[in-house]
Amino acid sequence: MSVPPDPDGRPWLLALHSSSESLGVGLQRLGAVAPERLETFPLGRSLSNGLFDCLESVLPASAWPRLGRLAVATGPGGFTGTRLTVVLARTLAQQLALPLDGISSFRLMARRLLTGPEPPGGDGPFWLLQELPRRGVVAGLYGADPGQPGGVAELEAPRLHRDREALAPHPIRPALVQLPEDVIQLLGFSGANAAEGRAAPWQPVLPLYPTSPVEALPC
């Protein structure tokens, strides 16, 4: 791929999402309102072997110095896929001295739902929930908030619950990744942060592991 020229010399915003069986990559000019490239790669367990090739098919390594900001979905998601993409994003941000926005995959889903035709919580908050066989449920609580980045408040970050009874009384929606739609949301979050001049150091950006083996199942 040849990188299209930009007469204003605006840098690129690159977004990576691997919290499902597929890798999503988005490329957008900082300050633009729409992505220039959106690609989905159904890599599954071969992500570790195909990650760099997929990234370079969207933006060649020779063009990485033209990046101005990075964004990555931090999960919850598969242990290996999420970890590899977050590590890659952190490495690029460190080596290129770029800001890095880490956004949970649940928060991206919430923004997609809130901007859809039927917001799931009406005027109030709602849960996003993922069922885990024999473990319980992973759920996060979200609501619309124009004062928050991307217009979405993460009222409770995704964590493990024994069952859905603890989630009353708010509405519950299934936590389902949709690509490339959720990559568009990731670009939107990061673009809004850039427009508002929000700092985004790479060091705090880490994968979310609600089902960590070192933590006991909630009572």
Protein language model annotation of sequence segments:
Residues S57, R90, Q94, T115-G116, ...:
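Short, well-ordered alpha-helices that flank and scaffold nucleotide-derived cofactor binding pockets
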